[in-house]
From Swiss-Prot:
Protein name, as recorded: Corrinoid adenosyltransferase MMAB
Subunit structure as annotated in this protein's UniProt entry: Homotrimer.
Disordered: annotated segments: 34-59
EC number: 2.5.1.-
Single Gene Ontology BP annotation: cobalamin metabolic process
GO CC list: mitochondrial matrix; mitochondrion
Enzyme class: transferase
Binding positions for ATP per the UniProt entry: 60-63, 68-69, 78, 190-194, 214
Length: 250
């Protein structure tokens, strides 16, 4: 979300996921703050001592009725297409985070790329959480998704592809723990792209968001193959299951 972009400058980006950024938005921007239970005004609440720092709660209860806020302040059902896209992007970042732990344990140099991608996914969430139909120029100033990350992914893809043997058959998710984890990330990325495409077609988000996810799935596929090669693990090849061939051998 946009506040994640702001949060990265405040040191929040590395500690908050996409959901956490929604919470940070409520703290950083007054329009997101709830008035609390019906009939209770802020002035009626017990005030903390001036000597005790106020620790914000992670839960706000504002979403208990099945609605949540976009960055623009618009309230939408939690199963809205916008939140489906944001949530799947968050899931993708979590999957990459798991793969990154495995990558770091092995000391692979592409760990930095994966971490950078996680940060970029925060920006993707920013753009998605700012629907164009309700966004003002002030919102878009923080959340417009540029083409730079797409070009960077293409450079990384070309770098690894040049070191890999050409594909001569369909491969299955395999090649060791890291390779398999990256294939899982690729599958989640494809789902995130499918959630984003309708928003692009409706004019709710920039086409660069869908382009980035499309390129990211290619990167994750290439990186999975590269990881298998670097670790000396064999990739499993797809072989058609032909029952007739088995019966002929009887």
């Amino acid at each position: 979300m946009a506040v994640c972009g702001l949060g990265s400058r405040l040191g929040l980006g590395s500690r908050l996921g996409l959901r956490g950024c929604f919470g940070a938005a409520r703290l950083l921007y007054p329009r997101f703050q709830s008035r609390g239970p019906q009939g209770v005004e802020d002035g009626d609440r017990p005030q903390p001592s001036s000597k005790t720092p106020r620790i914000p709660k992670i839960y706000t209860k504002t979403g208990d009725k099945g609605f949540s806020s976009t960055f623009t302040g618009e309230r939408r059902p939690k199963d809205d297409q916008v939140f489906e896209a944001v949530g799947t992007t968050d899931e993708l970042s979590s999957a990459i985070g798991f793969a990154l732990e495995l990558v770091t344990e092995k000391g692979h140099t592409f760990a930095e790329e994966l971490q950078k991608i996680q940060c970029t996914l925060q920006d993707v969430g920013s753009a998605l959480a700012t629907p164009c139909s309700s966004a003002r120029e002030a919102h878009l100033k923080y959340t417009t998704f540029k083409a730079g990350p797409i070009l960077e992914l293409e450079q990384w893809i070309d770098k690894y592809t040049s070191q890999l043997p050409p594909l001569t058959a369909f491969i299955l998710p395999s090649g060791g723990k890291i390779s398999s984890a990256l294939h899982f990330c690729r599958a989640v990325c494809r789902r995130a792209e499918r959630r984003v495409v309708p928003l692009v077609q409706m004019g709710e988000t920039d086409a660069n968001v869908a382009k980035f996810l499309n390129r990211l799935s290619d990167y994750l596929f290439t990186l999975a193959r590269y990881a298998a090669m670097k670790e000396g693990n064999q990739e499993k090849i797809y072989m058609k299951n032909d029952p007739s061939a088995e019966s002929e051998g009887l």
